[in-house]
Amino acid sequence: MPAAVDTAKTISKKRKRKHGGSAREATDNGVATSPAENGVEGKATETTTELTKDKDVELAKKVVKEEAQKKRKVSHSPSDEEESESEDEEKKEEDEKDNVKEDSGKANVPDLPSVDAVSLPQPDGGPKKFTELGLSEKTLQGIKEMGFETMTEIQQRTIPPLLAGRDVLGAAKTGSGKTLAFLIPAIEMLSALRFKPRNGTGVIVVSPTRELALQIFGVARELLTAHSQTYGIVIGGANRRAEAEKLTKGVNLLIATPGRLLDHLQNTPGFVFKNLKTLVIDEADRILEVGFEDEMRQIIKILPNEDRQTMLFSATQTTKVEDLARISLRPGPLYINVDHRKEHSTVEGLEQGYVICEADKRFLLLFSFLKRNLKKKIIVFFSSCNCVKYHAELLNYIDLPVLDLHGKQKQQKRTNTFFEFCNAKQGVLICTDVAARGLDIPAVDWIIQFDPPDDTRDYIHRVGRTARGANGRGRSLMFLQPSEVGFLKYLKEARVPVVEFDFPAKKIVNVQSQLEKLISQNYYLNKSAKDGYRSYLQAYASHSLRSVFDVHKLDLVKVAKSFGFSTPPRIDIQLGSSLSRDKKQQQQGRRSYGSQPKGLKFKRKHEDD
């Protein structure tokens, strides 16, 4: 029997020398030590040394063997593996890499484990801060550098289930923090699966407008500062060949507009998307409103749907959004609406008002308001591109500097204007609804709706450019003609609180005579004014709320005066044209909001957006 004990001790010592040395020795032997492993080892030693003389040699060997097997089964966390991965394992991994062809061909791209195979952090209770979510240190570092600590309501309710791999249909008002709500889980997934460029694209974010896509790209870039994953953007108007080259090299996180994304999916052979794990559709209602329904259906059909997590965010829930959710989300998605119990549809820090003004006094009132608020940061919304062009040219000509943003501009011009206004502390941006969705422009003081929004949803998105964030403050002003006050009823039904603002007539700067003289003498401004006048009437005639915004009730003489004409100019226009409203919206949407896929061209005599 003593021989049995000696044998057991000898085995234990050998095992201890083999596995219980320093961390360096363990690493050299290809084993990553951890507190869990040391506990198992200590238990094995104690169990072995405490064997009584009544135990035989075979039992001692059996105990030692069982404990050794337990040790081999101890799982390693990703962080432990990174810190103490053995040289043999690294060599093996390099051999595997050499066997993988880097030509981005779909058949040769290595498969990745499913999202369900990765244990993503699942928070307990109701976390309020990002540090309570169990996120990776690299992601937390990016969030901290961005200056965020406490989550908004949409982030509190969506991030935990998204981290757990659930499909989510989220509804939240603009400015609520949706971008971080979907980017954080997406980046955590890429990090957990250790995506490499050779694995292709793991996350695709679809955005309705180029500017919103650029904004999401900027947020993703800050979040990924400490991560090794690659990221990129494909949007209409940009260099397609350069985009294709980047996609071929491997873009793990891709932000895109629908038309250009579909173009690359169909026509870029090196675009690897077989490993797609997450699809994010942001501002889904707007994507569908501007005519990309067919493209979205094709995109969803092309993309792999096995084990794919889908996040669909929409400020409003329409029938089309529900149809898109039905074909894109897996059965049993989680529906999260953070606004349905709230008293108002707009954010609390927003003071909203309207002013009733005759058509011929509209420009005079706008000019006076801008002159009195030169130190403020203001966005002015118009109904068409031509209206924006005319007013930008006019205001800049008369030494009231403004920036302009609309769908007829080249992409580089739009991008430069957007970032210039974002970085400005004061100034005026006049634009179409291309800037109404999702754009996070810092510290906007006033939103002016010079031309009426198409409906209450557009109104909400326009005013959402100010009072953003947890404690954001801002004000909005809507111009209404006496015949348009019926729109207030629709705002009340939509739970939008507005009050009437009073602007004394004596404070309005009367420059009407100088304006008419300038327009009559300056050929280029005269032509621009005619285009703006025509587009204003066409946009008015196509309004969805025709019972309120009836073009036949307009006083054309007064409208013409607001554009600088003493008498209405002769223009070629067809009110109530043969184009249906939906088709017209689709055409305007493609030009103003995103990229237009190949083979889709629209012929029209007058482009009025």
From Swiss-Prot:
A motif (Q motif) lies at residues 128-156. ATP binds at residues 172-179. Residues 51-69 have a biased composition (Basic and acidic residues). Residues 1-131, 576-609 are annotated as: Disordered. Associates in the nucleolus with the 60S and pre-60S ribosomal subunits. Residues 80-97 have a biased composition (Acidic residues). It is found in: Nucleus, Nucleolus. This is ATP-dependent RNA helicase has1. The lineage of its organism: Eukaryota, Fungi, Dikarya, Ascomycota, Pezizomycotina. It catalyses: ATP + H2O = ADP + phosphate + H(+). It comes from the Eukaryota. Residues 11-21, 600-609 have a biased composition (Basic residues). InterPro entries: DDX18/Has1_DEADc, DEAD/DEAH_box_helicase_dom, Helicase_ATP-bd, Helicase_C-like, P-loop_NTPase, RNA-helicase_DEAD-box_CS, RNA_helicase_DEAD_Q_motif, SPB4-like_CTE. One of its GO terms (molecular function) is RNA helicase activity. Keywords: ATP-binding, Helicase, Hydrolase, Nucleotide-binding, Nucleus, Ribosome biogenesis, RNA-binding, rRNA processing. ATP-dependent RNA helicase involved in 40S ribosomal subunit biogenesis. Required for the processing and cleavage of 35S pre-rRNA at sites A0, A1, and A2, leading to mature 18S rRNA. SMART domains: DEXDc, DUF4217, HELICc.
